[in-house]
């Protein structure tokens, strides 16, 4: 009886140790390379991280994309005909990978703004940046059913289509040699002409208009920044057993 109890006790703790090792093996690839995460769940953190410039914002429970999350960021203009935005001044070098999620409601419910965009610049402000890009949605008829990508001042229609309700990922990637690319829905849309060395500013902005149909607000969620080119997909699986650990991870 004592012999049996000894081995049962030993096997119990060996099993726990093996499970712990397996969990660590699974978690490390997820967290490796993550340097910033904004899941738009905490008002205090959001106000600390972002400079708000006139835009109407709130944390909304209408949609959510973050693991174990409840809210997303709702942005809307407070007046028409002016840019309103929220910004972060940052200092990241290549390699760099940013991913954020935009809630697509279909073209019939498109945003009623000239531009509702993610902005990225290589200097402390977007206006002072020599290299800049934008990814987002426009109510302009020329972009009906698609997204809009700006490489500097040059606009182009996306290959990805805005055809149905879903979360869409917008990504900006700089690889080890400075080659920069924009991805939508995990597909490369464009490789930028100029090489990028750094990212100095990121922002989300709106420009309201009254001459286009659609809705006035837009929803964003789960911004991640990595100092690696390749990033994990596992972190966004809501039902994964690791989401609790992932949702608590925050690195500045």
What are these regions (language model features)?
Residues 148-169:
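Short, aromatic/His-centered strand-loop micro-motif at the edge of beta-sheets
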Residues 44-75, 80, 127:
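Extracellular glycan-recognition surfaces and repeat-rich motifs
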Residues 75-144:
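Secretory/extracellular carbohydrate-interaction modules
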Residues 31-54, 238-247:
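Extracellular carbohydrate-recognition regions
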Residues 40, 221-225:
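Extracellular beta-strand elements of beta-rich domains used
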Residues 192-221:
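Flexible glycan-contacting loops in extracellular carbohydrate-active proteins
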Residues 166-181:
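Localized edge beta-strand/strand-to-loop motifs within extracellular or lumenal beta-rich domains
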Residues 1-15:
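N-terminal secretory signal peptides that target proteins for export/translocation
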């Amino acid at each position: 009886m004592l012999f049996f109890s000894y081995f049962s006790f030993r096997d119990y703790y060996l099993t726990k140790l093996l499970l712990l090792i397996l969990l660590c093996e699974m978690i490390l690839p997820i967290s490796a390379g993550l340097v910033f995460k904004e899941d738009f769940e905490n008002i205090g953190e959001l106000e600390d991280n972002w400079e708000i410039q006139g835009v109407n914002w709130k944390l909304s429970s209408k949609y959510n994309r973050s693991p174990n999350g409840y809210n997303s960021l709702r942005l809307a203009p407070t007046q028409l005909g002016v840019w309103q935005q929220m910004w972060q001044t940052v200092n990241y070098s290549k390699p760099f990978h940013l991913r954020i999620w935009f809630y697509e409601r279909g073209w019939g419910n498109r945003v009623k703004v000239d531009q509702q965009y993610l902005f990225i610049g290589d200097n402390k402000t977007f206006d002072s940046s020599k290299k800049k890009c934008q990814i987002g949605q426009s109510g302009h008829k020329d972009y009906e059913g698609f997204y809009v990508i700006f490489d500097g001042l040059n606009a182009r229609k996306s290959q990805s289509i805005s055809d149905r309700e879903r979360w869409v990922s917008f990504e900006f990637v700089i690889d080890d040699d400075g080659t920069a690319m924009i991805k939508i829905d995990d597909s490369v849309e464009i490789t930028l002409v100029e090489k990028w060395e750094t990212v100095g500013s990121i922002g989300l902005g709106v420009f309201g208009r009254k001459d286009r149909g659609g809705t006035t607000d837009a929803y964003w969620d789960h911004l991640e920044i990595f100092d690696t080119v390749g990033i994990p997909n596992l972190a966004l699986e809501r039902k994964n057993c690791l989401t609790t650990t992932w949702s608590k991870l925050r690195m500045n």
